[in-house]
């Protein structure tokens, strides 16, 4: 009975093929090719992945590149940083490394397109958190990729704006360098260390108006001491760094300095005294105290009780006090000018910050 079925099945197969031809269906080469591909699952996945990546690149290329339309870039960068933060927060010792590496790659590309003043505060905060997370990475992961990323990041830092958060960036780099010293003696450790040294030097060479630990205001740099000296020694401390015990030239400068002093709740020397002639107040640069500045004395001051010949910031105004008393002090000097990239590149990098000796 099985022998009689085979001719019948062959006849049915021929009939079905004829019917398919009747409605215009043919087994084309493309159809056969697709059938062949479906037998190779990994290859199909690769083709689909390539198609998706190509579409993503097309979409990225449509992001506006002009500075006036830079907001979309900034938002994308900020989203990438947020995703990176989330990935880092979920780290176990040997997981999520591939995701972090991919996020770092995208972040590097985004930093290269940053306008000069966009999202710097957010980037700084994310870098701070990332530094802490890097210290928890397993000993052997992605060192070669990290080395390459640091090399390219150094070039990106060279394009950062000259000011904005330089002090914080410098401190973060210093701490990161110390963390690298504790890495296991694995591949590329020496190269990573050298890259960090060069990156730190590049940040130090960025043109900045004031040295580290000084405050910039209206073309001048101010150093607020953290130790105390008498009035004469305060003058010496400022002179040793090419500055002067502060001489106030305008109402705006007075308001700025008074605010700094009152916030810290400190008694602070200024460069004003009547040592040469009682009752005739004179600045350390030889200029007299203008009548319009007398309004800044506290009520009842100066009163010269017990030979009080030197002026200080006290509360919300000025007070006269004995010059031999130890108090905080403020130094002032002109800010550096930055004429362009040539001056920035030629200026030597300081080996250490240079506040007055305390």
Swiss-Prot record:
<keyword id="KW-0391">Immunity</keyword>
<feature type="repeat" description="4">
    <location>
        <begin position="165"/>
        <end position="187"/>
    </location>
</feature>
<feature type="repeat" description="1">
    <location>
        <begin position="96"/>
        <end position="118"/>
    </location>
</feature>
<feature type="binding site">
    <location>
        <position position="305"/>
    </location>
    <ligand>
        <name>Ca(2+)</name>
    </ligand>
</feature>
<feature type="disulfide bond">
    <location>
        <begin position="210"/>
        <end position="221"/>
    </location>
</feature>
<keyword id="KW-0472">Membrane</keyword>
<keyword id="KW-1133">Transmembrane helix</keyword>
<keyword id="KW-0677">Repeat</keyword>
<dbReference type="GO" id="GO:0005537">
    <property type="term" value="F:D-mannose binding"/>
</dbReference>
<dbReference type="InterPro" id="IPR050111">
    <property type="entry name" value="C-type_lectin/snaclec_domain"/>
</dbReference>
<comment type="function">
    <text>On DCs it is a high affinity receptor for ICAM2 and ICAM3 by binding to mannose-like carbohydrates. May act as a DC rolling receptor that mediates transendothelial migration of DC presursors from blood to tissues by binding endothelial ICAM2. Seems to regulate DC-induced T-cell proliferation by binding to ICAM3 on T-cells in the immunological synapse formed between DC and T-cells.</text>
</comment>
<keyword id="KW-0430">Lectin</keyword>
<feature type="short sequence motif" description="Endocytosis signal">
    <location>
        <begin position="31"/>
        <end position="34"/>
    </location>
</feature>
<keyword id="KW-0106">Calcium</keyword>
<keyword id="KW-0325">Glycoprotein</keyword>
<dbReference type="Pfam" id="PF00059">
    <property type="entry name" value="Lectin_C"/>
</dbReference>
<keyword id="KW-0254">Endocytosis</keyword>
<feature type="region of interest" description="Disordered">
    <location>
        <begin position="336"/>
        <end position="358"/>
    </location>
</feature>
<dbReference type="InterPro" id="IPR001304">
    <property type="entry name" value="C-type_lectin-like"/>
</dbReference>
<dbReference type="InterPro" id="IPR033989">
    <property type="entry name" value="CD209-like_CTLD"/>
</dbReference>
<keyword id="KW-1064">Adaptive immunity</keyword>
<feature type="short sequence motif" description="Endocytosis signal">
    <location>
        <begin position="14"/>
        <end position="15"/>
    </location>
</feature>
<feature type="transmembrane region" description="Helical; Signal-anchor for type II membrane protein">
    <location>
        <begin position="38"/>
        <end position="58"/>
    </location>
</feature>
<feature type="disulfide bond">
    <location>
        <begin position="310"/>
        <end position="323"/>
    </location>
</feature>
<feature type="disulfide bond">
    <location>
        <begin position="238"/>
        <end position="331"/>
    </location>
</feature>
<dbReference type="GO" id="GO:0045087">
    <property type="term" value="P:innate immune response"/>
</dbReference>
<dbReference type="GO" id="GO:0006897">
    <property type="term" value="P:endocytosis"/>
</dbReference>
<keyword id="KW-0812">Transmembrane</keyword>
<feature type="binding site">
    <location>
        <position position="320"/>
    </location>
    <ligand>
        <name>Ca(2+)</name>
    </ligand>
</feature>
<dbReference type="GO" id="GO:0016020">
    <property type="term" value="C:membrane"/>
</dbReference>
<keyword id="KW-0130">Cell adhesion</keyword>
<dbReference type="GO" id="GO:0046872">
    <property type="term" value="F:metal ion binding"/>
</dbReference>
<comment type="subunit">
    <text>Homotetramer. Interacts with C1QBP; the interaction is indicative for a C1q:C1QBP:CD209 signaling complex. Interacts with ICAM2 and ICAM3 by binding to mannose-like carbohydrates. Interacts (via C-type lectin domain) with CEACAM1 (via Lewis X moieties); this interaction is regulated by the glycosylation pattern of CEACAM1 on cell types and regulates contact between dendritic cells and neutrophils.</text>
</comment>
<keyword id="KW-0675">Receptor</keyword>
<dbReference type="GO" id="GO:0007155">
    <property type="term" value="P:cell adhesion"/>
</dbReference>
<keyword id="KW-0735">Signal-anchor</keyword>
<protein>
    <recommendedName>
        <fullName>CD209 antigen</fullName>
    </recommendedName>
</protein>
<keyword id="KW-0479">Metal-binding</keyword>
<feature type="repeat" description="2">
    <location>
        <begin position="119"/>
        <end position="141"/>
    </location>
</feature>
<keyword id="KW-1015">Disulfide bond</keyword>
<comment type="function">
    <text>Pathogen-recognition receptor expressed on the surface of immature dendritic cells (DCs) and involved in initiation of primary immune response. Thought to mediate the endocytosis of pathogens which are subsequently degraded in lysosomal compartments. The receptor returns to the cell membrane surface and the pathogen-derived antigens are presented to resting T-cells via MHC class II proteins to initiate the adaptive immune response. Probably recognizes in a calcium-dependent manner high mannose N-linked oligosaccharides in a variety of pathogen antigens.</text>
</comment>
<dbReference type="InterPro" id="IPR016186">
    <property type="entry name" value="C-type_lectin-like/link_sf"/>
</dbReference>
